[in-house]
Amino acid sequence: MEIKTSAIVLQTIKYGDSQLIVDFFTEKLGRLSFMVRVPKSSKGKMKRQLFQPLMVLNLEFDYRPKSNLQRLRDVSIQIPFSDIPFSPYKLGISMFLAELLSYATRHEQANGALYLFIQDSIEWLDHARGAIANFHIVFMIQLSFHLGFMPNIESGMSGDYFDLVDGCFAAHVPSHVHYLNKEDSMRLVSLFRLDYKTMHLYTMSRIERNRCVEVILEYYKLHLPGFPEMKSFAVLQELFA
């Protein structure tokens, strides 16, 4: 079956001298992996630089449902980046988001709302001109909504401790260790009220920001089985020191 779809690059693994295994989140079919042969010369469309993290591409291929690795017929750039490749901060964020999405969408089928959210977020990051130190935090929070486990912050009126397992506030300290103290809980409420346009208004120290990311990653681990340690988090910790 011939498929034409837009797709977002999540991960690229070198396979031999002239091939790549590329994981995409596609608009029409969700997660798919491709075996891509890249030319050794400058000729040909399948250039290695097309498959950088979060690149938004147009794909054409013959879909084989029983195959773990699809093969591209044609590829082109849908949304050219104007700033992400040239900004160390944006590049670091894009690497973090690509790794996050690679784990978080492993079993996702076609999900138009999720795809649109990711694509719009990538475009916003590329064009952003103000402070972006909180971008990945806002992205992670909003992504949890699309994945179906967004915390219930409305319960904050009835408790001081945020329960990471149940995703809501509790009046008393939970019987397990996966909960936030009062200070972290109130900070979480403030963060959940932010969007990309207002995130610059909320200032945090390096320690506070890293703590927020650690908390949200712990929440992801509790709600997404097999969610691993994020290697790219260390890069962000250094960038926004």
Predicted regions and their residues:
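Non-catalytic alpha-helical scaffolds and adjoining flexible linkers that form interface surfaces
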Residues: M1-A241
